[in-house]
């Protein structure tokens, strides 16, 4: 995924974050302040904001770009933000007895945007045993790759893992410096085009594993249930709008998200690697605490990040998900 090295790599809360937010145009409207990195999957929130889908439900939403997970999580902990958008495995690492927040809706999943680059002679992960693999440790890349290894009966101990950003890993692979890399677009397409190796596996083969969610503090959810419902309604309307007005939607989202995605053509290309979640997909994904994709994913997150001592507490479905708003009234 483009630029996730700043999007999903950091871990640990940082103190003393100072953020400024514009005043709301409507004084009596509900308020919600969210932090996130620059990412195509967050486009529907900007679309809902700029098309007025949040406002028509009585909600003003501030979307603040902060290119570091630790910084926006620190801002949430300090009360400067009400929540954030991130992968569900990422936010699990910050959940503690003293820092309560829960996912209220899912935004998207990686659907081909992440992958493993290898040389042409490699046909399985087992062929990489003992070899060097470039990967961003502590990021969603490590989480996803460990799921792949688990399916093959392998662990990182079977490989020689080198910690580097996803962009650096791709560059090192293309330069012939390492035999394998865990990275994302546009590097996957570049390797396919130049035929400098191949993509052994990408996230289109593992749907529902790299999932972005919006999480809000437990206090915000408790004190502002109507605003949370308004947010989810506006988000769903934006996702439905994309289905029928793609060109207009991509132009609005590109401008809103900005950064490396400010060109609508670049945004459209990046969007090929994600799947936006509408209401039906949210209901399917979250399932229940007893059964469903989210429950399984959270168990994997607790297991994998726990094995690397990244967790502050044992996290289960009920401690990280609030299902109350997935089907708004």
Annotate the PLM regions.
Residues 222-310:
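Secondary-structure end/capping motifs
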Residues 76, 128, 145, 173, ...:
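Buried hydrophobic packing residues in well-ordered domains
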Residues 39, 66-70, 85, 135, ...:
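Soluble non-cytosolic domains of exported or imported proteins
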Residues 1-13:
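Bacterial N-terminal signal peptides that target proteins for export
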Residues 26-163, 179-186, 201, 208:
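Short, glycine-/small- and polar/acidic-enriched structural segments
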Residues 89-90, 161-162, 168-262:
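Pocket-lining segment of extracytoplasmic ligand-binding domains
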Residues 301-329:
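Hinge/cleft segment of the Venus flytrap/periplasmic-binding protein
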Residues 17-25:
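C-terminal segment of classical bacterial N-terminal signal peptides
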């Amino acid at each position: 995924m483009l630029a996730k090295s700043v999007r999903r790599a950091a871990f640990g809360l940082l103190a003393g974050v100072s953020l400024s937010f514009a005043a709301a145009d409507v004084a009596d409207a509900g308020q919600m302040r969210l932090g996130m990195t620059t990412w195509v999957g967050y486009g529907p929130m900007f679309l809902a904001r700029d098309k007025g889908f949040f406002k028509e439900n009585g909600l003003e939403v501030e979307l603040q770009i902060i290119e570091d997970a630790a910084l926006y999580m620190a801002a949430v902990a300090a009360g400067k933000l009400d929540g954030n958008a991130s992968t569900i495995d990422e936010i699990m690492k910050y959940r503690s007895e003293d820092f309560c927040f829960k996912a209220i809706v899912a935004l998207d999943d990686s659907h081909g945007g992440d992958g493993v680059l290898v040389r042409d002679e490699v046909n399985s992960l087992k062929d990489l045993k003992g070899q060097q693999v470039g990967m961003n440790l502590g990021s969603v890349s490590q989480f996803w790759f460990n799921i792949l290894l688990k399916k093959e009966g392998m662990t990182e101990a079977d490989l020689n893992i080198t910690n580097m950003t996803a962009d650096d890993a791709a560059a090192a692979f293309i330069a012939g410096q390492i035999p394998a890399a865990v990275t994302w677009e546009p590097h996957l397409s570049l390797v396919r085009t130049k035929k400098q190796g191949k993509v052994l596996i990408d996230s289109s083969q593992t749907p529902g594993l790299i999932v972005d969610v919006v999480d809000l503090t437990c206090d915000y959810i408790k004190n502002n249930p109507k605003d949370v419902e308004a947010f989810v309604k506006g988000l769903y309307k934006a996702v439905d709008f994309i289905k029928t007005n793609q060109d207009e939607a991509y132009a609005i989202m590109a401008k809103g998200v900005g950064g490396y995605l400010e060109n609508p053509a670049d945004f459209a290309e990046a969007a090929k690697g994600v799947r936006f979640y509408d209401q039906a997909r949210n209901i399917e994904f979250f399932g229940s605490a007893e059964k469903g994709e989210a429950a399984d994913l959270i168990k994997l997150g607790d297991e994998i990040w726990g094995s690397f001592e990244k967790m502050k507490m044992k996290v289960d479905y009920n401690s990280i998900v609030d299902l109350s708003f997935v089907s708004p009234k």
